[in-house]
Amino acid sequence: MAAAVPQRAWTVEQLRSEQLPKKDIIKFLQEHGSDSFLAEHKLLGNIKNVAKTANKDHLVTAYNHLFETKRFKGTESISKVSEQVKNVKLNEDKPKETKSEETLDEGPPKYTKSVLKKGDKTNFPKKGDVVHCWYTGTLQDGTVFDTNIQTSAKKKKNAKPLSFKVGVGKVIRGWDEALLTMSKGEKARLEIEPEWAYGKKGQPDAKIPPNAKLTFEVELVDID
């Protein structure tokens, strides 16, 4: 027996309003969308985690798409659902061949940020500001490929943080985007997908392989 077709809960204006939390839209989609629909739109999993990676435009598009395609819960057979979910997973695992230059509808950010030490919550860098950072970069197996943090006392005394203009393409995009969300004094762990790191080519000189997901611990010590 087919499930009852849900009614639209919000108007377009309400969906785009800041008063409507992303979590409410995700909850609605998870309650009413079929598993394969949710998998295609990367909406499966813990609501809090999905809210971290999905932006509002992506959720609004998914909400409208759900009603256009009528792919509600209970409308697909189990075998079809598992096949589609499997296909989506396989496609996600393959390196993307689409043009990385395309900026329209990029979907959720290609990085996640975990705060290790809170900053002052008042001084945030803007595009074009010079930021000063200590950092350590590791591959998924834990290999450190780059750091400016010195361990010996002598080197530590002469060490200087990395300084660059943020948000203007001087560093990988994952850094540019993440640092704009950090406040002075904040230390965070950044897990950056290949698309916002070194992509399909990698960085052979730094021993970074193609399609590598990178992890950085970054401390924003100052902003000019």
Curated annotation (Swiss-Prot):
It is found in: Nucleus. This is Peptidyl-prolyl cis-trans isomerase FKBP3. One of its GO terms (molecular function) is signaling receptor activity. It comes from the Eukaryota. The modification N6-acetyllysine is found at residues 99, 170. Transmembrane segments: none annotated. Its EC number is 5.2.1.8. Belongs to the FKBP-type PPIase family. FK506- and rapamycin-binding proteins (FKBPs) constitute a family of receptors for the two immunosuppressants which inhibit T-cell proliferation by arresting two distinct cytoplasmic signal transmission pathways. PPIases accelerate the folding of proteins. The modification Phosphoserine is found at residues 36, 152. It catalyses: [protein]-peptidylproline (omega=180) = [protein]-peptidylproline (omega=0). Residues 128-224 form the PPIase FKBP-type domain. Inhibited preferentially by rapamycin over FK506. The modification N-acetylalanine is found at residue 2. Residues 89-111 are annotated as: Disordered. Keywords: Acetylation, Isomerase, Nucleus, Phosphoprotein, Rotamase. It holds the Pfam family BTHB. Residues 89-102 have a biased composition (Basic and acidic residues). It comes from Homo sapiens (Human).
